[in-house]
Regions:
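C-terminal domain-tail junction helix/linker
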Residues: 62-66, 88-163
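RNase H-like DDE/DDD metal-dependent nuclease/strand-transfer catalytic core used by mobile genetic elements
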Residues: 1-110, 114
């Protein structure tokens, strides 16, 4: 999954049956298609998983003008937003569901992403949904601050809209 840090919107996702690079690549391509060439000066932050460090993944980021940031340590708090969305998906939105096919998993994840982006408000974005927050310009008043923000000082996420 690819999460927009400003809006908390899931902007790219793909379901796979392994940890092969092809699945994160598909999620990244989904986001790049949405960006339509406007990815320059964005930062892609991830852990140091082999998928995100693969030459193909790194090349796609660089070819689209996206800067690369990776965690320094094995501390999950260094990639807290990714850990949080994975936890929310698994333990809140998909908890207790069983599937008999990959097609069922893909369909359920698609519905869950749609719900998460369009109907689930977040305290971290002033109780807006991610889609509502994505429509904003400027600083969003936050109800709480992340571990990373408390560690490095106040981080302001600004949403710049190209006209």
């Amino acid at each position: 999954m690819i999460l927009d840090s400003y809006s908390k919107e899931i902007v790219g996702w793909c379901v796979g049956d392994s940890l092969r690079t092809e699945y994160p690549l598909e999620a990244l391509k989904m986001e790049l298609k949405r960006l339509d060439g406007k990815g320059h000066n964005l930062i892609h932050h991830s852990d140091r998983g082999t998928q995100y460090a693969s030459s193909e993944y790194v090349r796609l980021l660089r070819d689209n003008g996206i800067r690369i940031s990776m965690t320094e340590t094995g501390d999950p708090r260094d990639n807290a937003q990714a850990e949080r969305i994975n936890n929310t998906m698994k333990n809140e939105l998909l908890k207790g569901k069983t599937f008999t096919s990959m097609e069922e998993v893909i369909n359920e994840v698609a519905k869950t992403v749609n719900f998460y982006n369009n109907r689930r408000p977040h305290m971290s974005i002033n109780n807006m949904t991610p889609v509502q927050a994505a429509a904003c310009v400027g600083e969003i008043t936050k109800k709480w601050h992340s571990y990373q923000e408390s560690k490095v000082g106040n981080i302001i996420y600004l949403h710049i809209v190209e006209l």
